[in-house]
């Protein structure tokens, strides 16, 4: 399997490049933020306070995430349900920010992201993707940009 990691600072255009490149190559683009949103959604649906690290950690063994490319678009599945639209609600974004602060969630998603890279051709972007998440990526790109036109 081929894995491409795009690292760089906020605002450098990582996501725009990653989505376009994944589409051109026919690879799955892994939106790591959507994964955090999915865990936030699960916590909200379970009635768990997303700020409660222990309660959220107790949910993790019940969560199965999968990312699939359908008709050229990424879809994220939470325990078999396509939650691609549901995770975009404002309250779920707030829950995602809360769960992302928990080390157990970060470890869980790190394992999940690496598992995805072992099972399909993927392209991931974000901070620390090439150094922490996919240190052995087939291709690593560090993207920078300036505010100048």
Regions found by a protein language model. Give the residues of each.
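Post-Walker A helix-loop "phosphate-sensing" segment adjacent to the P-loop in P-loop NTPases
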Residues: 22-31, 45-49
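Walker A/P-loop
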Residues: 15
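ATP-dependent small-molecule kinase phosphotransfer cores
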Residues: 34-121, 131-133, 148-149
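P-loop (Walker A) phosphate-binding loop of NTP-binding proteins
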Residues: 9
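Conserved phosphate-donor/acceptor-positioning beta-strand/loop module used by diverse small-molecule
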Residues: 135-149
């Amino acid at each position: 399997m081929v894995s491409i990691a795009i690292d760089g600072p906020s605002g450098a255009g990582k996501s725009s490049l990653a989505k376009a490149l994944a589409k051109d190559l026919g690879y799955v683009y892994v939106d790591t933020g959507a994964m955090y949103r999915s865990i936030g959604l699960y916590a909200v649906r379970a009635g768990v306070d997303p700020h409660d690290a222990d309660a959220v950690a107790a949910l993790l063994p019940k969560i199965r995430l999968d990312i699939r490319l359908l008709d050229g678009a990424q879809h994220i599945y939470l325990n078999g349900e396509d939650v691609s639209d549901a995770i975009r609600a404002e309250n779920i974004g707030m829950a995602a920010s809360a769960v992302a602060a928990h080390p157990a969630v970060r470890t869980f998603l790190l394992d999940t992201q690496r598992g995805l890279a072992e099972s399909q051709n993927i392209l991931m972007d974000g901070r620390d993707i090439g150094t922490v998440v996919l240190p052995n990526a087939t291709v690593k790109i560090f993207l920078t940009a300036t505010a100048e036109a």
